[in-house]
Every structure is written in structure tokens, then in C-alpha cells.
């Protein structure tokens, strides 16, 4: 397999071993690893996001891990800009860029490009979120299809985040999110990407997730959540979506 001109994309479910697999490949083909997980971006959440530790990063360069503060929303556009720069730098060093992640939108933006959708005022966005909450997801999704039929079959009808995003874009710009996405252009050719997907059967994956969760608690996940909660972040910040924060907070509050 000729990998010299490739950009390797590794994806898969939580606890499927993407990070360790990426290191294994990087050692064999002289690669460097770029983070493509939107939560491993945040520096204060090392344990809960399963960010590669110093031992795992030894001898292999890792990029874009723990670079953003949880007090900010780190956008897909910011990630894409930094990633394109890193890919070019890695290639100049005659090495292979290996991207590892669980964030589909990141990979999608790299492969297809990212269009600049006009900024939507937070007041307007909050209004749409409240509408979704009051209507319920099922009714809200049906309303989306009425104003934006192009959203049909594009994502899971139960995906609140994507439904709200599609609704606010169509409502504010009068243009479907999928028409905006049609205007994109990538910095790379499709043939440059080598896509690898790791998967396990359901039973094995559940076991791996359980083992990972136990390990996280042992190495300080509860303490990490305590520190995070002391920051008293605004609810709309992305870092609040890290899996484990809500669950461990309820545990700490004895709920």
C-alpha cells in the first residue's frame, strides 16, 4: 500500500482503541498524529476525554491535543484551519499525517471543505433552542422538515443538536444548511485520503467501555469533574458535552 501521498483518517466508536492503533501505524510508516476529536481539544479534560498520555505520545509527535480552554467554544472552522496547516508541515518533513477522531463533522470538513455560514446571533439561537425544548424533539423535527425539506434523511431525527442547527440556519439565512454545504471546496483531493474504521461487536465494545470507565475513575476522573464544576461554565459551552461530566456530577451530588 502506497501511503506516502496519503492523509490517513482513523475513526470508530468510543473505546475502540483508535489512539493506540494510530500510534502503531505511525511507528510503521513514519507518521505524526493529529487530534480530530472535538473534546480532546480541551486542556482541562484530559482524563474524561481519554486524551493520549505522555507515555502514549512518546516517540510519536501528537498535534492539537489539549490546546483550547474549556471556557471557549472551539469551532470546526478553527480546527480545520489548524489541521490544514499541520498536514502541510508534516508533509514537508516527509512524514505521513494520521488523523484520529470521533468527530464526524471534523472529518467531513476536511474531506469536503467548510463553508462560511453567516454568524447567527446568540439571542436568535437561544430562541430556537427554547422552541425545541418546548415542542419536544419529534414535533420540532417535523417542523424542520416543513421549512427545510432538504434535511430529510440527512441525519437521525433524534439528533437534537443537528436538528437545532439545521433549523436555525434555515430560519435565519433563508437557505438550507445543505445548500450551504454544497458550496464547499476541500484543500485536498479525495484520492489523498485513506479512511480506516475500527469496530468491535457490541458485547466486546461494552466490555471495553466498562474497563475504560473504571480506569478513568481510578486515575482521577472524579477529581477532574470537581475542578471542572468549580469553573461554573455557561451551559451552552461545548465542553459541558464531554461524556462523564453529567453522570459524575450526579454521583457527587448523590442524585
Please state what every model-predicted region is.
Residues 1-255:
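Phosphate/pyrophosphate-binding catalytic cores of soluble transferases and nucleic-acid-acting enzymes
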Amino acid at each position: 500500500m502506497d501511503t506516502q501521498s496519503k492523509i490517513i483518517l482513523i475513526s470508530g466508536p468510543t473505546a475502540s482503541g483508535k489512539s493506540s492503533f494510530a500510534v502503531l501505524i505511525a511507528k510503521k510508516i513514519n507518521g505524526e498524529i493529529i487530534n480530530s476529536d472535538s473534546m480532546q481539544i480541551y486542556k482541562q479534560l484530559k482524563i474524561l476525554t481519554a486524551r493520549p498520555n505522555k507515555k502514549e505520545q512518546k516517540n510519536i509527535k501528537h498535534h492539537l491535543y489539549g490546546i483550547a480552554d474549556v471556557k471557549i467554544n472551539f469551532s470546526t472552522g478553527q480546527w480545520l484551519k489548524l489541521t490544514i496547516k499541520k498536514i502541510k508541515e508534516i508533509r514537508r518533513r516527509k512524514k505521513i499525517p494520521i488523523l484520529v477522531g470521533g468527530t464526524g463533522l471534523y472529518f467531513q470538513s476536511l474531506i469536503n471543505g467548510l463553508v462560511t455560514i453567516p454568524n447567527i446571533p446568540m439571542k436568535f439561537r437561544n430562541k430556537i433552542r427554547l422552541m425545541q425544548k418546548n415542542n419536544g424533539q419529534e414535533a420540532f423535527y417535523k417542523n424542520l422538515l416543513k421549512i427545510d425539506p432538504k434535511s430529510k434523511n440527512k441525519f437521525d431525527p433524534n439528533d437534537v443538536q443537528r436538528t437545532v442547527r439545521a433549523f436555525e440556519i434555515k430560519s435565519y439565512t433563508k437557505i438550507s444548511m445543505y445548500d450551504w454545504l454544497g458550496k464547499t471546496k476541500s484543500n485536498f483531493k479525495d484520492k489523498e485520503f485513506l479512511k480506516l474504521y475500527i469496530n468491535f461487536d457490541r458485547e466486546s465494545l461494552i466490555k471495553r467501555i466498562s474497563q475504560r470507565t473504571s480506569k478513568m475513575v481510578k486515575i482521577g476522573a472524579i477529581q477532574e469533574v470537581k475542578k471542572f464544576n468549580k469553573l461554573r461554565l455557561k451551559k451552552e459551552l461545548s465542553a459541558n458535552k464531554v461524556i462523564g461530566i453529567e453522570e459524575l456530577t450526579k454521583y457527587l451530588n448523590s442524585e
